[in-house]
């Protein structure tokens, strides 16, 4: 069974959430670029957390047959970029995210709901 790019993006967002990343956003960039189908953007409070997210996603993708095509910034872990072809994950330290403003640069991208709304009691 093949995994769609959207399913990969949702898996990445869920991985970020499980590792306690903040402000997770999934952007559908298919109509505005050919470099990838989806960008996933999240914030972390420290470098260890950023590396843990990247490591966990690499393992999960490998389990479903997706190979990491490239990774940048893992040493410093202030902005980690993980490229899986169909999706690109941007893991930002909180202090870097506002400065680089990926969501602003890709403002024409459609945001994808990735999390089920909480049930109200």
What kind of feature is each model-predicted range?
Residues 1-26, 30-31, 45-52, 59, ...:
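Long, contiguous binding/interaction regions
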Residues 41-43:
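Short hydrophobic/aromatic beta-strand micro-patches
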